Swiss-Prot record:
Keywords per UniProt: Ribonucleoprotein, Ribosomal protein, RNA-binding, rRNA-binding
Protein name, entry field: Small ribosomal subunit protein uS3
Underlying gene: rpsC
GO-annotated biological processes: translation
Keyword rRNA-binding annotated: yes
Similarity comment: Belongs to the universal ribosomal protein uS3 family.
């Protein structure tokens, strides 16, 4: 049977950036890697309701910088930035180094595979019909500007005794094209009948000039300086 390679893994360094960007000596590498895992685990649990897509970790000069990509920055920041300060203190405690937390807003959550998968998972837990949840996610993504999307759910769908897999696709999702900007993510829905797995592929277009920018925030243009003496 044909198997699919992980769409993000095969594109690392081609069109996809890494989610941990640091260099370490042999003696520190394992500790840093485990620290990254613990920080991500803590933040994902703490920010479960904040629509977090991904967490990027950098380690400049014996410190840790965490960038949280979220569709609901207000939930992460909290009232007057109190929640961010609590998160910063916790991350510093886990990593054992001074921490800095940045928030990057996701402008179009309908095109983010992780947020789409989590949304479908939440709907299935609320007993929404799986076909309706899949179709709604696909229609929203295509309406916002996706060139293609595929959604796959597997498990005891609708409470059936025998588990099965169903999928729905619209547009094109070229998995073999390395320059294709394909966002892929998975999620789990814990229903009364058991766990249902969700996979989402979103094709946003082709990347023709190398790597994608990591942060989705638009750059502010600097005002032009007037020449002296005028």
């Amino acid at each position: 049977m044909g198997q699919k390679v992980h769409p993000n893994g095969i594109r690392l360094g081609i069109t996809k950036p890494w989610i941990s960007t640091w260099y370490a000596d042999k003696s520190d590498y394992a500790n840093n890697l485990h620290s990254d895992w613990e920080v991500r685990k803590f933040l994902e649990k703490k920010l479960e309701a904040a629509s977090v897509s991904k967490i990027v970790i950098e380690r400049p000069a014996k410190s840790i910088r965490v960038t949280i990509h979220t569709a609901r920055p207000g939930v992460v920041i909290g009232k007057k930035g109190e929640d961010v300060e609590v998160l910063r203190a916790e991350v510093a405690k886990i990593s054992g180094t001074p921490a800095q937390i940045n928030i990057a807003e996701i402008r179009k959550p309908e095109l983010d595979a992780k947020l789409v998968a989590d949304s479908i998972a939440q709907q299935l837990e609320r007993r929404v019909m799986f076909r309706r949840a899949m179709k709604r996610a696909v229609q929203n993504a295509m309406r916002i500007g996706a060139q293609g999307i595929k959604v796959e759910v597997s498990g005891r769908l609708g409470g059936a005794e025998i588990a099965r897999t169903e999928w729905y696709r619209e547009g094109r999702v070229p998995l073999h094209t390395l320059r294709a900007d394909i966002d892929y993510a998975t999620s789990e829905s814990h229903t009364t009948y058991g766990v249902i797995g969700i996979k989402v592929w979103v094709f946003k277009g082709e990347v023709l000039d190398g790597m994608l920018p990591q942060v989705e925030e638009p750059k502010q243009q600097q005002p032009k300086r007037k020449p002296r003496g005028k």
